């Protein structure tokens, strides 16, 4: 229930009557009825109701003409494309329920600021307020267009524009240069009625695809006035320019030639914490705005989308795949591309009949399941051990630990207190690792070894730990497989 209805249920509530003399006077049921009479019956019906209700004429002639031009009846609920095609073939469409209370689509995707946005910090700099006028009050004061262009040319992080009418080519050229040359993200929100004039200005500049890749243009309307018979569409009257998240210019100045040279305007430059409400307002406007595709309206090809499968597309959204993907699209642009492909696919199958598999949902489910089918991995071929290595020497078979020591598990090599295997074989992998770790330690200094002792393989000791460098002979051991004499261990110790 509405707050006014809940307040009426309160026992202690006193319904105070707010008249036209009160400052809080805003809504009047009699004025709403007069507005409905104007839109339904014209000027004559409006004047009769005003006279009957003893109201003052609250609408000027210009407002009455503008309201009648902005009024439009509610559109009928549009069914799916296939149902619409069948309805055309069988019988004409019948009127459905109004969208005023039963909307066809209530959940819409919030457009992301995919090019980036400034961090919202507690401190935005020194708060200052500067007023500029046209014509200038001081002799050397800059004109309003100069102030705006300097802000855009000095931008380094982000540029955000909210404007009712944007037709000045010089200002837009500065925005294009900032987006193309300095890679500054640009977001522009225009009034829906001024979009066509903005596109006319863009067509005169002969823009290329790569120059507008960092520019996002969207449109919004006013709040509007909803009635049972239709809706009055409002307009966007806000005008401000935000740069780098720390300064904003607002006022009556529009980005047009007339505002710069003909009209009298004010421009208020705010810095620091004063721009916090403008930051919130811009993000709210951007969330309810509609996309204006510059590539489509200007006839530009745009970036060609890659035909990724659904599995790969889901992975590319993950930031950890950014280095692998290379030239990966921003998430917002990828979602727009997917929605565009979905609309084109829906338009191509408009006249086709539904299949036996459940229609579009069944086809998507089947495509999703097919993407998840795993492919059997092909393992690399392993070359067999050469017979020469397996041939016995001196009537004794060679242990596989000498031919392929890497495939032996660590648990299968029990070691004794001196780093040797239990069967008398030394483990060269662990001995080498232990030797290198001690050799490159900062605390161990290796003195010069006499030439008489360096030629013979010996067992070196680092910090009371022995590391055998050669094969030591143990009784009953099979370590001597070369047939040579037994190597005598040396007692060389490095302190």
UniProtKB/Swiss-Prot annotation:
Modified residues (Phosphoserine): 4, 477
Main location group: membrane
Gene3D superfamilies: Endonuclease Chain A
Compartment list: Cell membrane
Biased composition (Low complexity): 447-458
Region called Disordered, residue ranges: 341-362, 384-495
DUF1669 as annotated region, ranges: 2-294
N-acetylalanine: residues carrying this PTM: 2
Keyword set, alphabetical order: Acetylation, Cell membrane, Membrane, Phosphoprotein
InterPro entries: FAM83, SACK1
Superkingdom classification of source: Eukaryota
Family: Belongs to the FAM83 family.
Record remark on domains: All members of the FAM83 family of proteins share a conserved N-terminal DUF1669 (domain of unknown function 1669) domain of about 300 amino acids. This domain mediates the interaction with casein kinase 1 (CK1) isoforms. Therefore, it has been proposed to rename DUF1669 the polypeptide anchor of CK1 domain.
Subunit structure and binding partners: Directly interacts (via DUF1669) with CSNK1A1 and CSNK1A1L.
Name of this chain's protein: Protein FAM83F
